């Protein structure tokens, strides 16, 4: 019965979203004493080791072709992690999650700019709705430090979209494990100079435990997500993943008493509805 359930793409997408929300909560807790770039380093280094072991077990070798695009995907993914973890450390989990889930908006823009894909006229209105929702969350007209952190969260969606476009170019020729390996290995290297001046030696078993848990849980989420895409259409998986916003909001309320304000809730609804519509439009 369990094996049958794990063949459900929708259930796997929900499990992936839940697992990543747990990772986000662990990141927020760790960020109380450790810099975001350092958390990215340990998350990526642990993940690199684990995915390498999976590659060995599956007999997946590193390619000699397509390396530049693999590196581009790695850099985009690394910058996504840095921005996302930084946002998680400074703004409510729900807010950071909503902003990161704007990546379909940027995927469409990048696909038009770099892949020459045509944007249907109806999509322009949906893009405007996404922008309006983002403005309601970032609140640029009531400038504060929150707005700066929210912009960083928005950048995480930009870099996630860049990584997604690169994956579309890579997935036909490269094994998923290899793509993930390059992502994590490059993220490890990118994090080193970013954390160099602010590095804090983890001083307690609790801090080491959090870092280890982040690395393991994040890779588990990646496995669930990869399997979800193999059992269900990309559109359905992408739409299902928006439940992650609910999970993140739940952790934020439960552990940090975070309650989104009315503008954030309204903006989040606009973004989710518009991005789901964008996903369905793109499929058609």
Swiss-Prot record:
It is found in: Cell inner membrane. Its main location: membrane. Signal peptide: none annotated. Induction: Is part of the operon cntOLMI that is negatively regulated by zinc level through the Zur repressor, which leads to transcriptional activation of this operon under zinc depletion. It is a multi-pass membrane protein. Keywords: Cell inner membrane, Cell membrane, Membrane, Repeat, Transmembrane, Transmembrane helix, Transport. Disruption phenotype: Mutant shows a large decrease in the extracellular pseudopaline level, with a concomitant increase in the intracellular space. Mutant is unable to grow in airway mucus secretions (AMS) and is impaired in iron accumulation in this media supplemented with iron. Residues 8-138, 151-279 form the EamA domain. GO terms for cellular component: plasma membrane. The chain crosses the membrane at residues 2-22, 34-54, 74-94, 96-116, 122-142, 147-167, 179-199, 209-229, 236-256, 259-279. Transports the metallophore pseudopaline, which is involved in the acquisition of nickel and zinc, and thus enables bacterial growth inside the host, where metal access is limited. Is probably involved in the export of pseudopaline. Belongs to the EamA transporter family. This is Pseudopaline exporter CntI. It comes from Pseudomonas aeruginosa (strain UCBPP-PA14).
């Amino acid at each position: 019965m369990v094996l049958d359930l794990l063949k459900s793409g929708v259930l796997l997408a929900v499990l992936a979203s839940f697992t990543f929300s747990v990772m986000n909560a662990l990141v927020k807790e760790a960020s109380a004493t450790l810099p975001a770039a350092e958390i990215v380093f340990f998350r990526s280094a642990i993940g690199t080791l684990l995915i390498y072991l999976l590659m060995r077990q599956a007999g997946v070798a590193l390619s000699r072709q397509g390396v530049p695009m693999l590196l581009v995907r790695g850099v985009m993914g690394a910058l996504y992690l840095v921005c996302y973890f930084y946002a998680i450390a400074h703004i409510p989990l729900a807010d950071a999650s909503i902003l990161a889930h704007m990546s379909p908006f940027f995927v469409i823009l990048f696909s038009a700019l770099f892949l020459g894909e045509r944007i249907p006229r109806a999509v322009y209105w949906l893009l405007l709705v996404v922008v309006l929702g983002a403005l309601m969350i970032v609140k640029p007209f009531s400038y504060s430090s929150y707005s700066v952190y929210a912009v960083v969260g928005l950048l995480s969606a930009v870099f996630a979209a860049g990584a997604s476009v690169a994956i579309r170019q890579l997935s036909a020729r490269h094994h998923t494990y290899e793509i993930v390996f390059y992502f994590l290995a490059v993220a490890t290297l990118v994090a080193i100079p970013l954390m160099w001046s602010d590095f804090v030696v983890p001083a307690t078993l609790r801090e080491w435990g959090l870092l280890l848990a982040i690395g393991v849980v994040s890779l588990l989420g990646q496995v669930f997500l990869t399997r979800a895409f193999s059992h269900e259409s990309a559109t359905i998986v992408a739409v299902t993943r928006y439940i992650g916003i609910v999970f993140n909001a739940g952790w934020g309320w439960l552990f940090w008493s975070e309650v989104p304000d009315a503008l954030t809730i309204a903006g989040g609804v606009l973004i989710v509805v518009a991005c789901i519509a964008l996903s369905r439009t793109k499929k058609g």
